[in-house]
Regions:
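Bacterial Sec-dependent N-terminal signal peptides
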Residues: 1-29
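Beta-strand-connecting loops/turns
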Residues: 51, 57, 65, 83, ...
Length: 305
C-alpha cells in the first residue's frame, strides 16, 4: 500500500509544482535557430518547438535567420525575428487580456491544426480531386471551394488558375434565375469585385464563374455565393472587430487568426485572402503552410497562387 501511495503523492506534487510555474507563452511555430534558457537551468539551451511552454524569467535566444511565433495565456501574440537575446519578462510587460477570448479560441484552432502531420495532407488529396471534378472545371480552376458565404459590404479578390493563359477572361455573377448581376472583362488571373455596389439581396444565393473571353469551351466550374443576412453580418463584423483588437497588425499570426475566423464562419473567400497574407509574412515557417494546406484540402481548393 505504501509503495503504491508514494508515487501517487510524488506525481501530485510534481503536477502542482508545474502548475505553480508562471507560463507566459506557448510556442506556436518556429523556424531557424531558436533556443530557450530556463531560469531554473541557466547555461542550458534547449531548442524551441511547437508547444514549448515559456515561463517568467526565461530567456529566448534567436539566431540571425530565426523566427518564433508565441501566443500568450491572455490570447495575445508575439513574433520574434532576427538575432538577439529576448528576456521573457520584457516580452510580456505590455500584455493584457482585453478582448482576447475570441482570439484565443482561434489560436487554439490553429494550434490544433498544426499538430496534424503532413501525411494527413497526402491522404486527403483524393478528396481534393473529387471536389474539383464536381465543379466542372474545363481549363480554369477558381481558387475557391464549390460554395462560400460572403459579406455584401466587402470588396473581394477572386483568383483563378488557368491551364493556359488567355488574352482576357470574363468573370460572371448570376442569380438563381441565371440572370446576369455582374460581369467584367479581365486581363490577368485575378479580379476585384465590390459586392457592396451590386445591391445583392441578403440570404440569397448567387453563382460565380470565369471563362476564356475568346474560347467559351474554356471555363471554370460554378461557385455558389451565399450573402450573409443582416443579423449574421452584424455578428461577423462585431466578432472580427474584437479579433482585430486582440491580434492587430499584418504579421503572420494575426493573419492566421483572421483566416481561421473566416474559415470557421464558412467565409472561405476571405479566409484565402488572410492565409495568403500569413504565408507571405513568414514564408519559411512550415507549420503555417501545413495549416493552409489542411484548409485547402478540407475545402477542395486546388493549386497555389
Amino acid at each position: 500500500m505504501k509503495t503504491k501511495l508514494f508515487p501517487t503523492i510524488l506525481a501530485t506534487v510534481i503536477s502542482l509544482t508545474s502548475f505553480a510555474q508562471d507560463v507566459v507563452f506557448k510556442a506556436l511555430a518556429s523556424s531557424g535557430d531558436a533556443t530557450i534558457e530556463r531560469s531554473s537551468t541557466p547555461g542550458v539551451y534547449d531548442p524551441i518547438k511547437m508547444g514549448t511552454p515559456v515561463y517568467k524569467n526565461d530567456k529566448i535566444i534567436m539566431g540571425a535567420n530565426g523566427y518564433l511565433g508565441l501566443t500568450s495565456t491572455a490570447g495575445k501574440t508575439v513574433q520574434l525575428k532576427g538575432e538577439g537575446i529576448y528576456p521573457v519578462n520584457d516580452l510580456s510587460g505590455d500584455l493584457n487580456a482585453d478582448q482576447s477570448d475570441i482570439a484565443s479560441k482561434y489560436i487554439a484552432y490553429i494550434f490544433d491544426g498544426m499538430k496534424k502531420e503532413s501525411s494527413s495532407i497526402s491522404s486527403n488529396m483524393s478528396l481534393t480531386g473529387s471536389v474539383e471534378r464536381s465543379l466542372g472545371n474545363a481549363g480554369i480552376n477558381l481558387f475557391l471551394p464549390e460554395s462560400t458565404k460572403i459579406k455584401s459590404d466587402k470588396v473581394s479578390t477572386i483568383n483563378w488558375i488557368a491551364n493556359e493563359d488567355a488574352t482576357s477572361y470574363k468573370i460572371v455573377l448570376l442569380n438563381l434565375f441565371d440572370e446576369e448581376v455582374y460581369s467584367a472583362e479581365i486581363k490577368g488571373n485575378s479580379a476585384e469585385i465590390n459586392f457592396g455596389a451590386l445591391g445583392l439581396s441578403a440570404d440569397e444565393i448567387y453563382k460565380l464563374s470565369v471563362k476564356d473571353n475568346n474560347n467559351q469551351k474554356v471555363h471554370s466550374g460554378v461557385v455558389t455565393l451565399q450573402i450573409l443576412d443582416g443579423e449574421e453580418l452584424n455578428k461577423v463584423n462585431t466578432d472580427f472587430a474584437a479579433i482585430e483588437a486582440a491580434a492587430p497588425g499584418d504579421d503572420a499570426i494575426s493573419n492566421l487568426v483572421k483566416a481561421s475566423f473566416y474559415e470557421q464562419n464558412g467565409m472561405y473567400m476571405e479566409a484565402v485572402e488572410y492565409f495568403e497574407k500569413a504565408i507571405k509574412a513568414a514564408p519559411d515557417v512550415e507549420q503555417y503552410k501545413i495549416v493552409y494546406e489542411n484548409f485547402k484540402n478540407k475545402t477542395g481548393i486546388n493549386g497555389e497562387l
